[in-house]
Amino acid sequence: MTTQSLEAEAKALNDRLEGLDLAGRLALVAGLEGRAVFTTSLGIEDQVITAALGSNRLDIEVATLKTGRLFNETVALIEATEEAYDILIKRYYPEKADIEDYVAQYGMNGFYESVEARHACCGVRKLRPLARALEGASYWITGLRRGQSGNRAATPYAEADLERGLIKINPLADWDIDVIRAHVAAEAIPVNPLHGRGYPSIGCEPCTRAIKPGEPERAGRWWWENDEKRECGLHVAEAASSIIPNASSAA
């Protein structure tokens, strides 16, 4: 598919998704021609989407990135969620050789020392496994919301991911955190207990801290960096090709 046609399809799909509720948005994507993959980090937004997929028995793959540095609470939630909704969450892991190369160059916790080292860690633990998860996919469903950070304030319902050659679907783009929490409570959706301990956004354990009152939702991610647009590379335009070598071809 050409860049122009991918962007045109994304725009048309964005318009169709806007007037639908969550179940309707996911059902629309499930009915499209082509493979759809939802990648979950087991955060509260992703649990809302997983619950909707499981409850409505929609034919959309669910995948997660087992980075090797996740909180124990996150790991435990994977199996609990599978049992709750009778679904399979496919695990994607970093390659052993990639981890060994990273540790040899930067050290096990070298990501604290520089942005370059942190990007390299995200590259081997997240971006390369993500490329395998999305291989051959036409649609990538995420839990991105406009309220998560200033960097995500303009998140559409559908957007062309030109680097990966697919359309990214953000069915919760217009949901704020209060709506998310109310929905979770009403539907008794299982969530990570860390959310109740001051962690609204949860990534790898060494790179996530609880936030302080009044801080943005994602302030606890890579908190030692000064850049206000801190991201791991999964959801930014520069991401894969600038963070890991040959990532574009891998995706």
From Swiss-Prot:
Gene Ontology MF terms in the entry: 4 iron, 4 sulfur cluster binding; adenylyl-sulfate reductase (thioredoxin) activity; metal ion binding; phosphoadenylyl-sulfate reductase (thioredoxin) activity
Enzyme class: oxidoreductase
Short name of any one Pfam family annotated for the protein: PAPS_reduct
Keywords of this entry: Cytoplasm, Iron, Iron-sulfur, Metal-binding, Oxidoreductase
Cofactor binding remark: Binds 1 [4Fe-4S] cluster per subunit.
Subcellular location field: Cytoplasm
SUPFAM superfamilies hit by this protein: Adenine nucleotide alpha hydrolases-like
CDD domains per UniProt: PAPS_reductase
Active site, per annotation: 232
InterPro entries noted in UniProt: APS_reductase, PAPS/APS_Rdtase, PAPS_reduct_dom, Rossmann-like_a/b/a_fold
Protein residues bound to [4Fe-4S] cluster: 121-122, 204, 207
Gene Ontology CC entries for this record: cytoplasm
Pathway: Sulfur metabolism; hydrogen sulfide biosynthesis; sulfite from sulfate
NCBIfam families the UniProt entry points to: APS_reductase (TIGR02055), PRK02090.1 (NF002537)
Function: Catalyzes the formation of sulfite from adenosine 5'-phosphosulfate (APS) using thioredoxin as an electron donor.
Family the UniProt entry places it in: Belongs to the PAPS reductase family. CysH subfamily.
Name recorded for this polypeptide: Adenosine 5'-phosphosulfate reductase
Organism whose genome encodes this protein: Sinorhizobium fredii (strain NBRC 101917 / NGR234)
